[in-house]
From Swiss-Prot:
InterPro entries: Flavoprotein-like_sf, RNR_Ib_NrdI_bac, RNR_NrdI. NCBIfam families: nrdI. GO terms for biological process: cellular response to iron ion; protein modification process. Belongs to the NrdI family. It comes from Yersinia pestis. The lineage of its organism: Bacteria, Pseudomonadati, Pseudomonadota, Gammaproteobacteria, Enterobacterales. PANTHER family: PROTEIN NRDI. This is Protein NrdI. Probably involved in ribonucleotide reductase function. The gene is nrdI.
Length: 134
């Protein structure tokens, strides 16, 4: 199965969610990586939303840098976003932005650490997504 590529800040919320999925995954480095992450196969991006509800800063800078690499951007096939409902209309805004800019489907959104139901839905959805692609 193709991997999830994900970003998680030092809070580790997204990382903990990805671990629960028990799916192949590659983490975008937080900072200070000597080499840029370069993927070699199609992937689904899992991203947290930041910015406190503002479109400015909603997508983490590390994710922007990763997607600014034309090769990495060419392999994205879908996006999943985490967010905080306290952001109101901007809940999971990073997913909307990436889906629109990269022209890929917005597959799922969940709040903060996600629930057991979110984990099951994402695991099932990702598996079915890749089955349809092959």
């Amino acid at each position: 199965m193709n991997p999830l590529v994900y970003f998680s800040s030092s809070s580790e919320n997204s990382h903990r969610f990805v671990e629960k999925l028990q799916l192949p995954a590659i983490r975008i480095p937080i900072a200070g990586a000597r080499e840029k992450l370069r993927v070699e196969q199609p992937y689904i991006l899992l991203v947290p939303s930041y910015g406190g509800g503002s479109p400015v800063g909603a997508v983490p800078i590390q994710v922007i840098r990763f997607l600014n690499d034309v090769h990495n951007r060419s392999l994205i096939r879908g996006v999943i976003a985490a967010g905080n409902t306290n952001f109101g209309d901007a809940y999971c805004l990073a997913g909307d932005i990436i889906s629109h800019k990269c022209q890929v489907p917005y597959l799922y959104r969940f709040e903060l650490l996600g629930t057991a139901e979110d984990v099951a839905n994402v695991r099932k959805g990702v598996t079915e997504f890749w089955q349809r692609q092959n």
